[in-house]
């Protein structure tokens, strides 16, 4: 092999090395799956039934607790749309979200309550801002009625 060719190949390899070794933190983490979402909802429903609202809501509101992972968190509304728990933002507790709409104007809290009350459990699809990457994306929340409470967990469905 000619000395120039060796130099050219060595240079190309050296230039590609930083790209190959670059940290992957800049890449978006994969979204949670429907199975992971359902598992967290099932866990939250079991907690609410076993421990009652006081202990369960405190656990759901704990940003470092077992009910918040990556993009998944538990939220709870009463039948009037008032937040009883929010793993995303506990400061929302006590605020009325009944008129909250998605990016396309869909009344998502009203629909979550209606689906849970009508069927006992179900899913609601909507368009929501993903704060991890500031993109508006399709989101799906799985909701379930437990007594007077609507418990939900949402994931970005791509």
Model-derived regions, located:
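N-terminal membrane-sensor/transducer module of prokaryotic signaling receptors
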Residues: 2-4, 11-158
